[in-house]
């Protein structure tokens, strides 16, 4: 698949286009231009390194939404075996913007749950652009309860712009469904390992992200509102999204510094979409390390640790000026 370049990546795109042009010429010519191709390839790689070493929060937001970025089912295919998807909330419908099911990770039975966006127009519409309705969150709750019943660790993958705010979703109890998931996950008697793989949009993300460990991919985001939404409220213009992204502190490094996440998983050069298999290998290692950390822990110790972790959120210290 041809790589889609973002607007700030245009210098890289121009170099890559030149490299492709030279490769085409070399195939149809007896002239050896392999050295020039190699030189330009190294130049492109260095340019990518330099560019990605100094990304703004808004640019990170763009990468997190990249249309070729791996989604939950892509990681399921790479990391898990014997995946059997489970459907429906047993109350209203099956919301396919959240997928989940039984699987094996490194031979260990587990439950996998995650947001799922679409690749083309038809699939995006079917999956509601990764914005779950209440039945999606209730399906997730059902699968979590099932995992608890059989003592299976839960892996959740977060990638959503937010919960769907439609009238029907609100009428069917969107806020109640999200709130219940927060309550359920806080007390589940089984390990929960959460990874933000793309967008972590507000309560829609948090509803499957109350974990014993929360990790983020290097170029993913996690915030209470999108930069555009924040800009529209504060500046009355979505054009101020870059400033809003800066103010929101939505990057993995910022959230790690605040103690809101536990680990950052580095991405391949140019982002996860440039090397999905390489990203999957890095993610596999991080998930295995996290699972190993909790496997020998008693249920009581696990829940106590989770409670203390949640209670540590939002703590601050007041000081007297001049003291």
Curated annotation (Swiss-Prot):
List the GO terms this entry assigns under cellular component, sorted alphabetically.
Answer: acetyl-CoA carboxylase complex
The pathway is: Lipid metabolism; malonyl-CoA biosynthesis; malonyl-CoA from acetyl-CoA: step 1/1
Q: Which GO terms describe its biological process?
A: fatty acid biosynthetic process; malonyl-CoA biosynthetic process
- Which PROSITE patterns does the UniProt record give? COA_CT_CTER
Instruction: State if Endoplasmic reticulum is listed as a keyword.
Output: no
Where mainly located? cytoplasm
Q: Where in the cell is it found?
A: Cytoplasm
Q: Which UniProt keywords apply?
A: ATP-binding, Cytoplasm, Fatty acid biosynthesis, Fatty acid metabolism, Lipid biosynthesis, Lipid metabolism, Nucleotide-binding, Transferase
Superkingdom, natural source: Bacteria
Which InterPro entries does the protein's record reference?
A: Acetyl_CoA_COase_a_su, ClpP/crotonase-like_dom_sf, COA_CT_C
Q: What is its EC number?
A: 2.1.3.15
Q: Which residues form the CoA carboxyltransferase C-terminal domain?
A: 39-293
Q: Which GO terms describe its molecular function?
A: acetyl-CoA carboxylase activity; ATP binding; carboxyl- or carbamoyltransferase activity
Q: Which reaction does it catalyse?
A: N(6)-carboxybiotinyl-L-lysyl-[protein] + acetyl-CoA = N(6)-biotinyl-L-lysyl-[protein] + malonyl-CoA
A Pfam family of this chain: ACCA
Q: Which SUPFAM superfamilies match?
A: ClpP/crotonase (SSF52096)
Does the keyword field hold ATP-binding? yes
The entry's function note states: Component of the acetyl coenzyme A carboxylase (ACC) complex. First, biotin carboxylase catalyzes the carboxylation of biotin on its carrier protein (BCCP) and then the CO(2) group is transferred by the carboxyltransferase to acetyl-CoA to form malonyl-CoA.
Q: Which NCBIfam families match?
A: accA (TIGR00513), AccA_sub (NF041504), PRK05724.1 (NF004344)
* Assembly, per entry: Acetyl-CoA carboxylase is a heterohexamer composed of biotin carboxyl carrier protein (AccB), biotin carboxylase (AccC) and two subunits each of ACCase subunit alpha (AccA) and ACCase subunit beta (AccD).
Q: Which family is it part of?
A: Belongs to the AccA family.
- Name of this chain's protein: Acetyl-coenzyme A carboxylase carboxyl transferase subunit alpha
- Lineage, opening ranks: Bacteria, Pseudomonadati, Pseudomonadota, Betaproteobacteria, Burkholderiales
């Amino acid at each position: 698949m041809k790589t889609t370049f973002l607007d700030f990546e245009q210098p890289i795109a121009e170099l890559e286009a030149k490299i492709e042009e030279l490769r085409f010429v070399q195939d149809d010519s007896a002239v050896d231009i392999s050295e020039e191709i190699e030189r330009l390839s190294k130049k492109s790689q260095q340019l990518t390194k330099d560019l990605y070493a100094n990304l703004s929060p808004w640019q990170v937001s763009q990468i997190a939404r990249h249309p070729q970025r791996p989604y939950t089912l892509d990681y399921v295919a790479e990391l898990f075996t014997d995946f059997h998807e489970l459907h429906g909330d047993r109350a209203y419908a099956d919301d396919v913007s959240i997928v989940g099911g039984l699987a094996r990770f490194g031979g260990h039975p587990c439950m996998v749950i995650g947001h799922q966006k679409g690749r083309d127009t038809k699939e995006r519409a079917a999956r509601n652009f990764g914005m779950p309705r209440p039945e999606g969150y209730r399906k997730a709750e059902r699968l979590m309860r099932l995992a608890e019943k059989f003592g299976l660790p839960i892996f959740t993958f977060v990638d959503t712009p937010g919960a769907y705010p439609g009238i029907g979703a609100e009428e069917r109890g969107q806020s109640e469904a999200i709130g219940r998931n927060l309550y359920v996950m806080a007390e589940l008697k089984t390990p929960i390992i959460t990874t933000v793989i793309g967008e972590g949009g507000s309560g829609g993300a948090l509803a499957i992200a109350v974990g014993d460990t929360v990790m983020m991919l290097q170029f993913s985001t996690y915030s209470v509102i999108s930069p555009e939404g924040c800009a529209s409220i504060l500046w009355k213009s979505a054009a101020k999204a870059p400033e809003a992204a800066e103010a929101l502190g939505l990057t993995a490094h910022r959230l790690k510094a605040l103690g809101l996440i536990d680990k950052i998983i580095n991405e391949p050069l140019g982002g996860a979409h440039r090397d999905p298999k390489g990203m999957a290998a890095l993610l596999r290692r991080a998930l295995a390390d996290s699972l190993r950390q909790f496997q020998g822990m008693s249920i009581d110790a696990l829940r106590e640790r989770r409670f203390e972790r949640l209670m540590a959120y939002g703590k601050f210290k007041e000081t007297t000026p001049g003291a």
